[in-house]
Amino acid sequence: LEQQQLQGARCMECGVPFCQYGQMIAGMASGCPLHNLVPEWNDLVYTGNWEQAYERLKKTNNFPEFTSRVCPALCEAACTCGLNGDPVSTKENEYAIIENAYENGYAAPRPPRVRTGKKVAVIGSGPSGLAAADMLNKRGHSVTVYERHDRIGGLLMYGIPNMKLERTIVERKIRVMEEEGVTFVTNADVGKDIKPAKLLKEYDRVILACGASNPRDINAPGRDAKGIYFAVDFLSANTKSLLDSNFADGKYVDTR
C-alpha cells in the first residue's frame, strides 16, 4: 500500500481539484460523474487512515468495488498533475481502498437499525437497480429486487467480460446487500411471470430500473452477414456459457 500512499501524497500538490466535479467541457466529460471526493480520500490514504478513506469514498459511490475495475477514470484525465507528468493513479487508489475495506472488515454488512415499514419493489438488478435498492435499504425501507434472468447483476453480471469484472466480485456485493436486508428474486419477468398490478398492490412504491437491453442497429452493407452479432448479445451468451460451465477457476474457453 506504500505506492498508493505515495500517489495520495501527489494528489495534495493540486490547487484546483478538477477531478471531482464531473463537468462538461467542450462537449466532453471532465472529472468524476459521481462527484467522488477524490482529494479527500486520497489525503486519507496518504496519512494511512484507510477506514476513514473508505467511509469518505462510500459517501458518493455505492459500488467502488465495480467502478475501481471498469471505470474509464475520467478523474485521472482531469488531474492537474498530468499536465507535467503522469496523473495521480486515483483509480488504483480507489481499488486499494475498497479491497482493504473488505480485507479488514470495514465493508462488513450494516443492516439499518430502524425499519420504516415501507415496502419498495425494484424491477431490474443492473447497476441502477442495485444502487436504488442499496440506498432505499439504508434508509430503512424493505426492498425486493426482481430480476428476469437467473442471476443478479444485469450488465454487471452478463455484459462485462470476466477479465474486466470477475463475477465473484459482483456476487460478493450481492451477499453483503442480502445480509443488510435486501431481498432478491430471480427468474421473475415482471409483466409476464408477475403482474404489475400485483406489485402495485403489495408495495408502497415500484421502481423501474429495466435498463436498455435493445441494441441500436445500423443500415450498412453486409450488416446481415454471418458471424456479425450485437456486442451485448455476444457478451451475454459467452458469459452465461462460462457461468454454466461449473469450472471453479473460471478458466473456460468455448471454441464453438
Predicted regions located by residue number:
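Short flanking/linker segments adjacent to small metal-binding domains or redox-active Cys/His motifs
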Residues: R69-T90, K119-M135
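Ferredoxin-type iron-sulfur electron-transfer modules in oxidoreductases and energy-metabolism complexes
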Residues: L1-L6, A29-S30, L34-R69, A73, ...
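Non-catalytic alpha-helical coupling and interface elements of nucleotide-dependent molecular machines
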Residues: V16, Y46, E76, T80, ...
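Glycine-centered loop/turn positions within well-structured domains
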Residues: P39, E51, A77, R216, ...
